[in-house]
Amino acid sequence: MNQKKKIENYQQIAMGTGLRYDEVGGLFHGERDGFDFIVYAPDARYPYMMVLHTAAKSADGSTFDKQAVKGFQKSSKKIASFGQKNLDIRVSLKAQSNAEKCKDTLNEALAATTTFLRTNSYSPCCDLCGQNVETGAFRMGGEYYHLCPDCETKMRSDIAMKTQQKAQKKENIVGGIVGALLGSLLGMLSVLILSQLGYVCLLYTSPSPRD
């Protein structure tokens, strides 16, 4: 499937799910039952095999047990797996053959996921600080985040600082290499000039005096 056709199909999926399609980022994002979702295809070879990503925390700070996860995965034939890491919730969906089936799968999985989270007293939150505030979807450094305005500002600032430090380190390394090369060249030039003037000295050991 060529890129133009893929974009057209993704736009149809967006219309059918109420999500927004970001053509530049190649992902969908939007809200369902108060939860901020990012939806993307992790493998370009399978454009209709999606992953749902959101951030949520339980009322008591606990995580899902294996039995609850197993029950959720069995609740829908469209769900392949469920993953939880800290505040990250990821739901992998089974691959579909076309845009229409992908749209139906997304609607079913989004509804099932929000119901599962709400039933287990989970609420939407910021990926970093964990506060129950409005968040926005972001992709930085190949990772996906749901960030509140304060954490977004902090993350952007940290990235800018690291980028600046990396650039400075590069400049220092280049400067050191150039300095070493110049020093070496100047040393060779000095030896050459001195040798032309007859000032190159040789170190030698004088012979011991004979008795």
Question: Predicted segment positions?
Answer:
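Short cysteine-rich clusters marking metal-coordination/redox-active sites
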Residues: 126-129, 148-151
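Cytosolic-side membrane-insertion boundary helix
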Residues: 154-176
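Short Lys/Arg-enriched alpha/beta "domain-start" segment
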Residues: 1-73
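Short, non-helical or kinked segments that cap or interrupt transmembrane helices
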Residues: 195-203
